[in-house]
Curated annotation (Swiss-Prot):
Reaction equations catalysed: ATP + H2O + phospholipidSide 1 = ADP + phosphate + phospholipidSide 2
Keyword 4Fe-4S: no
Name of the encoding gene: ALA6
Organism: Arabidopsis thaliana
Positions bound to Mg(2+): D888, D892
A Gene Ontology molecular function term of the record: ATP binding
UniProt family annotation: Belongs to the cation transport ATPase (P-type) (TC 3.A.3) family. Type IV subfamily.
Location within or outside the cell: Cell membrane; Endomembrane system
Top-rank taxon: Eukaryota
Membrane spanning stretches: 76-97, 102-124, 307-328, 361-378, 944-963, 978-997, 1028-1050, 1064-1086, 1093-1113, 1131-1155
Protein name as annotated: Phospholipid-transporting ATPase 6
Length: 1240
């Protein structure tokens, strides 16, 4: 009987739950009212047919669709999307008007290009939606075990599952809907759930059923089971659930601990039973499946303005043309009697010029419509898809360890990669690996652990390498006999004044890595290993330290059947590192039951492990507010212990007077660990007597079982009563390793002119240490720390006082930056989440942004996911420049979606960030190549491609206008309709696509060697209005040259030996030939990099024109019309036709050649110089010259290893100068004293 009561009491405890990952269960507004607004859902358990019988409570099916279209909506919705674009809509109107007599063209010459372009885009949409449909079919066809009645379960597809069904889910299966947990294979009704698909977290969550349904542990138990759930309506909040279960005449409150969400997976549990509460699109995961925000690049936005400019040009020339036609009709039409202007229905009736003007305006708008590039949008889409393919296939962006390539999840933002100004980065899992290694510890005032952290090794090694590159500058320093086993260390008495940071050699680093044989454990100190700790003077404290590590946690052990080793599933990587460390120290956590944990302790006299049981009485969960976790346990001797671990500031303030014996030494050790970039926690304990614990546990039980909005507050108060009078044992130091190549990547990005901000949830000390390791911070950099430490939260007007304090600190910091006279001075801004709350207020945020922009580094600590998104929005909207956010966890989704470009890292925290991102990479270091290489290329390609599009269409379209003016604004086209059909779609589209896909101003290795080239993108050198208008002007010039030369050569004179003169068709064909040559030769001159593909597309397009002209002219007259045998019999035999083409090519390209030659000679751009250096490098023997030119092509930066080394060299030079000055004074003094002594 006593055992049953104990078991019942333990079942009512929620010590298995990880509340640190959830907000409050209930709303802060107060108790919820079931059956009130928002809480009207009624679920009949095991009776799904009742929902079908009652129309008022009919719920959605479990069928899920993520497609944008279906068979009925595809055509109207997709057509709307296509004609939402201004250019496409214009050509739609033009195609409709082309069927009327007003059109100067054959209707098919207008309809066919439009159908081709729109059809291609719609085909792309259909393909993408088909892929989504097939994914939906796969998900909806999954099967689950569903109760059929009479205690029998059968397999049923997910789409046929209904609200109220009882479902049995097996281990490693996904939950098919949102379920209420009824029972599980564990006797206490718990189960372990992986929610990676929901929140991106890979750590297991623990769910627990109600005691009332605990007995439903077999299939037969559900034969007569029934109940009613009354709960909240469907909503997207993953972490709240309010409702109750009516069963057997009793009402039981429900909370999120009983809810199993769709798309989460059952882990470490044989099976569970649950009742379906929400199905299909009512489930929380589907309620959260909002579309990612639509993002458009800056180039695309500017392109819209250029299209509007071309429309203005179109309207202008159309207005001029129609006005000219009206004037000609009024003044001269009477003389042109053969046009029969006397007919009442005639458009050329001189008595009605206004009518003639209006009608001709429509004709002119159709005639000059080729000023608008109809194939621009589809060509850009094709180019961007191909660019994204090359990004995906780049082996330099492939992570061989994880087998993960880079992925361009959207192709709309390729060119935006080349215009980034500010990078906002998460820390854990992004800059660091999120792989925790136990490295050092402090126990009883003694520090243990002799191994250096990887961040120290990486920073020191990189500095030594940079110092070697600057050998000429360092050679002037007083160094000892050269390099010893270290890369660079100034030894001896002379060099002691100029001490550099110690740098470990590659061999030392290799040895250190070889010594690391256990994942999560990089500790090395023989004083604690192999039971040597028993010989330490404070062995009792060391024993308690190890036991706290092994017992105070919420982890789950899993035994590897092959190796017999225990692995651990824990709520954080830190806890895994603690358990691995305790195992290596001889205290292995082997088993957890509903009420106990078992530790195999290996320090007995026999040398064999002894299993000890610790009964868990209570667990006080870790939360971000509490910053600590405690376990109340009873050991085998019957002693009740409170074991506590948490942030040092929290633990230290809860120590008893007698528990502060090691406080001073431990604090010093924590500071040292923090400076080494390590994550720290303090450990303490307290012994409890039975009476004290019984009284407290009664209060704790009341708080645990309470139902109301203040439940969490009650738990916090009760917990706070117990977690005091602690005895300090020591502290841990865990290393969150830097990802491979992070320091070098940050250095190169800084030299490319990019600003880097770090937004992290870690404490300030840890973030600062990682900043030093990455060289975002360095010695000598002036840190501006904005905080609210001096503001009293209890004041009546605390918010106003906080904002006033922040504004004062920002103003003082801004003044300090302005009056700083040292040009090399660098400032770093550091702010925590609490202060950031006020700094992001509307009346403060722009002053805060101005200060942040003036600083070389910005580090925001202890920030929430919402604050990350708000900071990103402020940087994006406040500066007006392109921002990139990069992260790896679910808490980074907000800032990834808010930034202009979101980059997700496919790391250990799940795929939530990747799914929300625009680009995904496996490691932070790949960001350098993604931006500096692919970003630079894509920006320049797209910019040149768009400018060329406008050039070729202006060149072509204006020749029609000139011919109109020449022919009295007749509305007649000089070109055959088939020419118009081919111009944009065939004859000029492939070369421009090759430009957008293959163009390289410099190779990839040179992009990385000369990072300052990247600044051409943020400065928008290739798509500013100066360059755009220059290309347009070039198009106007080319059109004038082509028309005037052809008119002068072919008009009213023979062009063949037989005296034949050129008619309009011959002149039009010759002019069109010149256009094809001119625009294709122009694109060839624009390219800096040729492959055989580009040659084929450019010269093949020109050849295709002649082939078409020859073949089309051979068709019967009914088909070929007025170009019958145009090439073979009329133009080809005439030498003047070929000479005209050569003359036009020379005349149209000479200005461009003159411009580019002048620019390269007088005012070259960076890539021009680098191209020449690269070209002539084979004749350069002096490698130092190459390095010197590389250094010139780097942006001046105040962060990164380069800036760090520069600062160190300036520091050393200053010291040397001061020392030389002292020596000079001393030598001068001694020389003055010598004559006087001689005279005496």
């Amino acid at each position: 009987m006593a055992r049953r009561r104990i078991r019942s009491r333990i079942r009512k405890s929620h010590f298995y739950t990880f509340r640190c990952l959830r907000p409050k269960t209930l709303d802060d507004q107060g108790p919820h009212v079931i059956n009130g607004p928002g809480y009207t859902r009624i679920v009949h358990c095991n009776q799904p047919h009742l929902h079908l019988a009652t129309k008022l409570i009919r719920y959605r099916s479990n069928y899920v669709s993520t497609t944008r279209y279906n068979l009925l909506t595809f055509l109207p919705k997709c057509l709307y999307e296509q004609f939402h674009r201004v250019a496409n809509f214009y050509f739609l109107v033009a195609a409709i008007l082309s069927v009327f007599p007003l059109s100067p063209f054959n209707k098919w010459s207008m309809i066919a290009p439009l159908v081709f372009v729109v059809g291609l885009s719609m085909g792309k949409e259909a393909l993408e939606d088909w892929r989504r449909f097939m994914q939906d079919v796969e998900v909806n066809s999954r099967k689950a075990s569903v109760h059929k009645g009479s205690g029998d379960f059968g397999r049923r597809t997910w789409k046929r599952i209904r609200v109220g069904d009882i479902v049995r889910v097996e281990k490693d299966e996904f939950f098919p809907a949102d379920l209420l947990l009824l029972s599980s294979s564990y006797e206490d009704g718990i189960c372990y759930v992986e929610t990676m698909n929901l929140d991106g977290e890979t750590n297991l969550k623990v769910k627990r059923c109600l005691d009332a349904t605990l007995a439903l542990e077999k299939d037969e138990s559900f034969q007569n089971f029934s109940g009613t759930i009354k709960c909240e309506d469907p909503n997207p909040n993953l972490y709240t659930f309010v409702g109750n279960l009516e069963c057997d005449g009793q009402v039981y409150p429900l909370d999120p601990n009983q809810i199993l969400l769709r798309d989460s997976k059952l882990r470490n549990t044989a099976y569970v039973y649950g009742v379906v509460v929400f199905t299909g699109h009512d489930t929380k995961v589907m309620q959260n499946s909002t579309k990612s925000p639509s993002k458009r690049s800056r180039i695309e936005k500017r392109m819209d303005y250029i299209i509007y400019t071309l429309f203005a040009l179109l309207l202008t020339v159309s207005f001029i043309s129609s006005l000219g036609f009206a004037v000609m009709t009024k003044l001269l039409m009477a003389e042109w009697w053969y046009l029969r202007p006397d007919k009442p229905e005639s458009l050329t009736n001189p008595t009605n010029p206004l009518y003639a003007w209006v009608v001709h305006l429509i004709t002119a708008l159709l005639l000059y419509g080729y000023l608008i590039p109809i194939s621009l949008y589809v060509s850009i889409e094709v180019v961007k898809v191909l660019q994204a393919h090359f990004i995906n296939q780049d082996l330099q962006l492939y992570d061989s360890e994880s087998g993960t390539p880079a992925q361009a999840r959207t192709s709309n933002l390729n060119e935006e990669l080349g215009q980034v100004d500010t990078i906002l980065s998460d820390k854990t899992g992004t800059l660091t690996c999120n792989q925790m290694d136990f490295l050092k510890c402090s126990i009883a005032g003694t520090s243990y652990g002799v191994r250096a952290s990887e961040v120290e090794l990486a920073a020191a090694k990189q500095m030594a390498m940079d110092l070697e590159e600057k050998g000429e500058e360092v050679a002037n320093l007083s160094m000892n006999k050269g390099r010893t086993q270290r890369y660079a260390k100034l030894a001896s008495k002379t060099s002691s004044d100029f001490e550099l940071e110690t740098v470990v050699t590659a061999s030392d680093e290799k040895d250190q890595k070889q010594n690391t044989g256990v994942k999560g454990f990089s500790f090395e100190d023989n004083r604690l290993m192999n039971e040597n700790w028993l010989n330490e003077p404070n062995s009792d404290d060391i024993l308690m330290f190890f036991r706290i590590l092994a017992v105070c946690h919420t982890a789950i052990p899993e035994v590897d059947e092959d190796t017999g080793m225990c692995t651990y599933e824990a709520e954080s990587p830190d806890e895994v590192a603690f358990l691995v460390a305790s195992r290596e120290f001889g205290f292995e956590f082997t088993k957890r039951t509903q009420s106990s944990v078992f530790i195999a302790e290996r320090f007995s006299s026999s040398g064999q492990p002894v299993d000890r049981e610790y009964k868990i009485l209570n667990l006080l969960d870790f939360t971000s507010k509490r910053k600590r976790m405690s376990a109340i346990v009873r050991d085998e001797e019957g002693q009740i212990l409170l074991l506590c671990k948490g942030a040092d500031s929290i633990i230290f303030e809860r120590l008893s007077k007698s528990g502060k014996e090691y406080l001073g030494a431990t604090s010093k050790h924590l500071n040292v660990y923090g400076e080494a970039g390590l994550r720290t926690l303090a450990l303490g304990y307290r012994k409890l007597d039975e009476t004290e614990y019984a009284a407290w546990n009664s209060e704790f039980h009341k708080a645990k079982t309470s139902v109301g909005a203040d439940r969490d507050e009650m738990l916090e108060k009760v917990s706070d009563m117990m977690e005091k009078e602690l005895i300090l044992v020591g502290a841990t130091a865990v290393e969150d390793k830097l990802q491979k190549g992070v320091p070098q990547c940050i250095d190169n990005l800084a030299q490319a002119g990019l600003k880097i901000w770090v937004l992290t949830g870690d404490k300030m000390e840890t973030a600062i240490n990682i900043g030093y390791a990455c060289s975002l911070l360095r010695q000598g950099m002036k840190q501006i720390s904005i905080s609210l430490t001096n503001v009293e939260e209890s004041s009546q007007n605390s918010e106003a006082a906080a904002k006033e304090s922040i504004l004062m600190q920002i103003t003082n910091a801004s003044q300090m930056i302005k009056i700083e006279k040292d040009p090399h001075a660098a400032f770093a801004l550091i702010i925590d989440g609490k202060t950031l709350t006020y700094a992001l207020k509307d009346d403060v945020k722009y002053q805060f942004l101005a200060l942040a922009v003036d600083c070389a580094s910005v580090i925001c600590c202890r920030v929430s996911p919402k604050q990350k998104a708000l900071v990103t929005r402020l940087a994006k909207e406040g500066t007006g420049k392109t921002t990139l956010a990069i992260g790896d966890g679910a808490n980074d989704v907000g800032m990834i979606q808010e930034a202009d470009i979101g980059v997700g890292i496919s790391g250990v925290e799940g795929m939530q960030a990747v799914m929300a991102s625009d680009f995904s990479i496996a490691q932070f270091r790949f960001l350098e190549r993604l931006l500096v290489v692919h970003g630079h290329w894509c920006y320049k390609r797209i910019a040149q491609m768009i400018c060329y599009f406008f050039y070729k269409n202006i060149t072509f379209g204006l020749t029609l206008f000139y011919f109109e003016c020449f022919t009295g604004f007749s509305g007649q086209s000089i070109y055959n309709d088939s020419y118009l059909l081919l111009f944009n779609v065939v004859l000029t589209s492939l070369p421009v696509i090759s430009l957008g896909v293959f163009e390289q101003d410099v190779p990839s290795d040179v992009c990385l060697q000369f990072p300052a080239l990247y600044q051409q993108g943020p400065k928008n050198l290739f798509f500013d209005w100066y360059r755009i208008l220059g290309w347009m002007g070039n198009g106007v010039y080319a059109s004038i040259v082509i028309f005037t030369l052809n008119l002068g050569i072919f008009h009213v004179q023979s062009f063949r030996s037989d005296g034949q003169t050129a008619d309009m068709n011959a002149m039009g064909t010759a002019m069109f030939t010149c256009i094809i040559w001119a625009v294709n030769v122009q694109i060839a001159l624009t390219m800096s990099h040729f492959t055989w593909i580009q040659h084929v597309m450019i010269w093949g397009s020109i050849g295709a024109w002649y082939v078409f002209l020859a073949l089309y002219g051979m068709l019967p007259v009914k088909l070929s019309g007025n170009i019958f045998h145009m090439l073979v019999e009329i133009l080809a035999p005439a030498p003047i036709f070929w000479l005209t083409s050569l003359l036009v090519i020379a005349a149209t390209t000479l200005p461009y050649l003159f411009h580019i030659s002048y620019q390269r000679s007088v005012n070259p751009l960076d890539h021009h110089i680098i191209q020449e250096i690269k070209h002539f490098r084979i004749d350069v023997e002096d490698e130092r010259m190459w390095k010197r030119e590389k250094s010139k092509a780097r942006e001046k930066t105040k962060i990164g290893f380069t800036a760090r080394v520069d600062a160190k060299i300036r520091q050393l030079r200053g010291r040397l100068q001061r020392k030389h000055s002292v020596l000079s004074v001393m030598s001068g003094t001694s020389s003055n004293d010598t004559p006087s002594s001689n005279s005496q």
